[in-house]
A protein has these predicted regions:
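Nucleotide-binding/hydrolysis machinery
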Residues: 4-14, 20-24, 30, 34, ...
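Conserved post-Walker A coupling segment in P-loop NTPases
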Residues: 14-82, 86-94, 98-99, 162-169
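Surface-exposed alpha-helical interface segments used for non-catalytic interactions
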Residues: 40, 107-111, 149, 153
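Short alpha-helix of the ABC ATPase nucleotide-binding domain corresponding to the H-loop/switch region
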Residues: 68, 106-107
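Conserved Walker
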Residues: 76-87, 92, 98-105, 111-128, ...
Length: 169
C-alpha cells in the first residue's frame, strides 16, 4: 500500500483496516513523523489499544538497552515512563528508524521476534505488537547485505510506503 500526495489526517480507517484486523508486524517506509502518527492510529484502532504504546528510537545511542528493556519484561527497567507493570501489559512497541540498528542488535531482535506471541492476551511472557519504521527502503539494504534478511521478513509482514508528499498530523 502506498500513501501519497494527501494529508495523513485524510487517511481513513479503511486505509489501515487490513493492518487493524491482523496482529502481524507492520513496517512503514517513508517519512518518520508520518509513520509514528500512523503507528499510533493503528494502535488506537487495534485490539492492542488497551495496552501501552511504547516508542523506541533506534537511531539514538541508547537504543540497545531501551529496546532490550521493552522486549524483555522479566528484566525490564523504566522505559519512557513505562513502569514494570505497564511493560508487562500487552501493547504496541514502535521501533522508529529500525534500519539504524547495528548488525548484532538486528540479529538479537530477529531472534526475539521469532519467539514473540502476537495476540492480545497471549500466554507467553512477552505480548507485544511490533510496528516499525524506516526512512530508507530496507529491502535494498537487505540486498546490499547491511540489514538482516530474517529481521526484515519478520518486520515486513504488512508493508506500507509513505510518499514524501504526505504530511504528519
Amino acid at each position: 500500500m502506498t500513501i501519497q500526495e494527501r494529508d495523513v489526517a485524510a487517511i481513513t480507517d479503511v486505509d489501515l483496516s487490513h493492518a487493524v484486523q491482523s496482529d502481524a508486524c507492520v513496517l512503514f517506509t517513508g517519512d518518520d513523523g508520518t509513520a509514528e502518527a500512523l503507528a499510533r492510529r493503528l494502535h488506537a484502532l487495534s485490539g492492542w489499544r488497551h495496552g501501552p504504546f511504547i516508542a523506541v528510537d533506534c537511531s539514538l545511542p541508547d537504543a540497545e538497552p531501551r529496546l532490550l528493556q521493552v522486549l524483555d519484561v522479566e528484566n525490564a527497567a523504566i522505559v519512557e515512563g513505562a513502569t514494570r507493570p505497564r511493560l508487562a501489559q500487552a501493547g504496541t512497541v514502535f521501533l522508529r528508524e529500525v534500519g539504524k540498528l547495528g548488525p548484532g542488535l538486528q540479529r538479537r531482535l530477529s531472534e526475539r521476534l521469532a519467539t514473540l506471541k502476537t495476540r492480545p492476551g497471549a500466554e507467553r511472557r512477552l505480548r507485544r505488537r511490533v510496528i516499525s519504521s524506516s526512512s530508507v527502503p530496507l529491502d535494498s539494504r537487505v540486498q546490499e547485505g547491511t540489514f538482516d534478511a530474517r529481521l526484515f521478513y519478520r518486520l515486513n509482514v504488512i508493508h506500507m510506503v509513505i510518499s514524501g508528499h504526505a504530511r504528519g498530523w
